């Protein structure tokens, strides 16, 4: 097996051209929107807290995560043959799970940061010092790498000697398992256990952290409630949008479903574009910092 053929979103050529314009616009918005958040955090002194440090890494992860699939999809929508080499498929699969796994760990780290900020405010700067923040980000990277490496290692044990048509627009685990001509039962269980355990346990830890935060907020005033919920609301919205499809994929049956491609579009493209929208619209400090960055840029252009 030297290559795989993708079945993109629609066989209709006109629909593919429309999808090309839509996904090109969405991917451009993902890169520009998330890069704007990274640039704003890096250049704004008012956004020097660990929360924004983690947010800048999350935005960078969103760019990388969507870049694992979106550019190939966009180019395939105009190509006659939607093909990818075997090694290209493995690389796409690795980076998709590497960046996706890293993002899951990073979202969990951000939940811990919110927990410390709300439940232990007096010790926040001591607990969440820059050395700890750097280590936590490093753990997220290592965790994502180990998750992806395990998935790829399992795929390498499969034999592909028959059909090479993938009923998807990128290399994903379930479609590849269906093409294997060797026994996939045990490997399939290990793949589901690896990805499912990461998604479900991380989501459970996130929910538990927010339950503890809500219990802690019972003694706060209404003003404190509003401030705390404003701090956590954006992160919780991103968590729900990201983990919803992940949990669905982990708990769904192994059969191919008609909505699989739409769900994949949601967790590879839509969530990445919603991240800058959610954080810029709900966070007053971020909006002010972006405004100051825009004013500084205009002044530099005038000079």
From Swiss-Prot:
Q: Where are the transmembrane segments?
A: 18-41, 50-71, 93-112, 132-150, 188-211, 228-250, 262-281
Residue ranges, Extracellular compartment? 1-17, 72-92, 151-187, 251-261
Please state the protein's primary subcellular location.
membrane
Cystine residue pairs: 89-181
Give the GO cellular component terms, alphabetically: plasma membrane
* Cited CDD domains: 7tmA_OR4A-like
**Name the record gives this protein:** Olfactory receptor 4X2
What is the scientific name of the source organism? Answer: Homo sapiens
Give the gene symbol.
OR4X2
């Amino acid at each position: 097996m030297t290559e795989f053929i993708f079945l993109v979103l629609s066989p209709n050529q006109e629909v593919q051209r429309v999808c090309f314009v839509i996904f090109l616009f969405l991917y451009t918005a993902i890169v520009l929107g998330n890069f704007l958040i990274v640039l704003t955090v890096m250049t704004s002194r008012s956004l020097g807290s660990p929360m924004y440090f983690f947010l800048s890494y999350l935005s960078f992860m969103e760019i990388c995560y969507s870049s694992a699939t979106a550019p190939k999809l966009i180019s395939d929508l105009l190509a006659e043959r939607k093909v990818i080499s075997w090694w290209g498929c493995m690389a796409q699969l690795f980076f998709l799970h590497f960046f996706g796994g890293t993002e899951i760990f990073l979202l969990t780290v951000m939940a811990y940061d919110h927990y410390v900020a709300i439940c232990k405010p007096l010790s926040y700067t001591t607990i969440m010092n820059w050395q700890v923040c750097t280590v936590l980000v490093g753990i997220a990277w290592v965790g994502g790498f180990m998750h992806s490496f395990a998935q790829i290692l399992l795929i390498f044990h499969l034999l592909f000697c028959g059909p090479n048509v993938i009923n998807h627009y990128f290399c994903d685990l379930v479609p590849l398992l269906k093409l294997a001509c060797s026994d996939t039962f045990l490997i399939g269980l290990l793949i589901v256990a690896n990805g499912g355990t990461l998604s479900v346990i991380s989501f459970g830890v996130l929910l538990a952290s927010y339950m503890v935060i809500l219990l802690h907020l019972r003694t706060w005033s209404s003003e404190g409630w509003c401030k705390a919920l404003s701090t956590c609301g954006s992160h919780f919205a991103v968590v729900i949008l990201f983990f919803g499809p992940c949990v669905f994929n982990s708990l769904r049956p192994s059969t191919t479903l008609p909505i699989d491609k739409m769900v994949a579009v949601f967790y590879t493209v839509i969530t990445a574009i919603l991240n800058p929208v959610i954080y810029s619209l709900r966070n007053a400090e971020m909006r002010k910092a972006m405004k100051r960055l825009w004013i500084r840029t205009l002044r530099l252009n005038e000079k």
